[in-house]
């Protein structure tokens, strides 16, 4: 009762009935070859019986993409399903007509890059931030599975022994907001005493520049002052560059709405080129031994 037909959950791919039964076995010919139902998360509960087929702490019902929600009991089953279930076992509100088995919605697959429906995809929106994190749940070992592995589940496929999960999820898990660099972030070199700008070209919408003066061991968040300007923008201006900044490293902490994970850019190195040294003027004297007013000499 999660709103996803068992015929789809059995293999995790769309299945279209052929409408024929050549061998008269009572089954549509699409089932001529028996296929064992898949268990995507290997928890011994097949997907068609599993309320969380990928163990990310988000019910399949929420990840399915249909409009029928589970807000009353938050048990992973459609609210009031018993009042609307059809003869075929599917909620009539999800069909174009009762019991015609034609869905009036498309099963969610927002990233479309891995052939996985959202209810099977640990990163449904493809933004390199796991669903469990973006949904607002806890994954201490960062394996994209809710809780700490190895996991245990109940008879409905829900992970047990966890501190949260299986409540209404934050919506970030379904909003594709990857944090990327549009162009390489590379080392820079500027002249001493100049006012110069380092820029980062990223899909992020929030920036915090950081600096390290010890080879990247320790980092400090930059604030705007007489030396720096634009510490929370994509362009960091450095005024009156001093040789003391030579070999400093810079990086940017990046955030984007819709991506809970955030990211940090690679570090780049600043080279400060010293101004040329001007020596004192030297007076040169040369004898003109032939009194023609011209004389050759080497500098």
What is the meaning of each model-derived region?
Residues 1-180, 290:
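Extracellular calcium-associated, cysteine-rich motifs in secreted modular proteins
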Residues 183-191, 279-292:
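Short, solvent-exposed loop/edge segments of extracellular or virion-exposed proteins
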Residues 194-202, 292-299:
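A short beta-strand segment in extracellular, disulfide-stabilized domains
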Residues 231, 242-250:
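Solvent-exposed loop/turn motifs of extracellular immunoglobulin-like beta-sandwich domains
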């Amino acid at each position: 009762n999660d709103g996803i037909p068992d015929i789809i959950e059995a293999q995790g791919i769309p299945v279209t009935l052929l409408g024929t039964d050549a061998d008269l076995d009572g089954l549509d010919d699409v089932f001529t070859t028996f296929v064992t139902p898949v268990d995507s998360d290997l928890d011994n509960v097949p997907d068609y019986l599993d309320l969380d087929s990928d163990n990310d702490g988000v019910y399949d019902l929420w990840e399915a993409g249909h409009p029928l929600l589970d807000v009353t009991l938050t048990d992973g089953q459609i609210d009031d399903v018993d009042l609307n279930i059809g003869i075929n076992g599917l909620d009539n509100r999800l069909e174009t007509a009762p019991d015609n088995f034609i869905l009036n919605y498309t099963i969610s697959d927002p990233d479309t890059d891995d052939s996985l429906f959202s209810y099977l995809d640990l990163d449904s929106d493809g933004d390199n931030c796991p669903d469990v994190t973006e949904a607002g749940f806890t994954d201490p070992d960062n394996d994209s599975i809710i809780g700490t592995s190895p996991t245990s589940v109940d008879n409905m496929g829900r992970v047990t022994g966890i501190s949260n999960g299986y409540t209404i999820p934050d919506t970030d898990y379904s909003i594709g907001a990857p944090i990327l660099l549009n162009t390489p972030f590379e080392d820079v070199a500027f002249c001493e005493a100049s006012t110069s700008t380092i820029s980062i070209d990223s899909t992020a919408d929030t920036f915090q520049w950081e600096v390290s003066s010890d080879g990247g061991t320790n980092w400090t968040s930059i604030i705007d002052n007489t030396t720096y300007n634009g510490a929370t923008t994509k362009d960091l201006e450095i005024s009156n560059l001093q040789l003391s900044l030579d070999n400093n490293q810079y990086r940017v902490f990046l955030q984007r709405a819709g991506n809970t994970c955030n990211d940090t850019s690679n570090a780049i190195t600043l080279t400060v080129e010293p101004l040329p040294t001007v020596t004192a003027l030297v007076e040169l004297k040369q004898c003109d031994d032939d009194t023609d007013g011209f004389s050759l000499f080497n500098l």
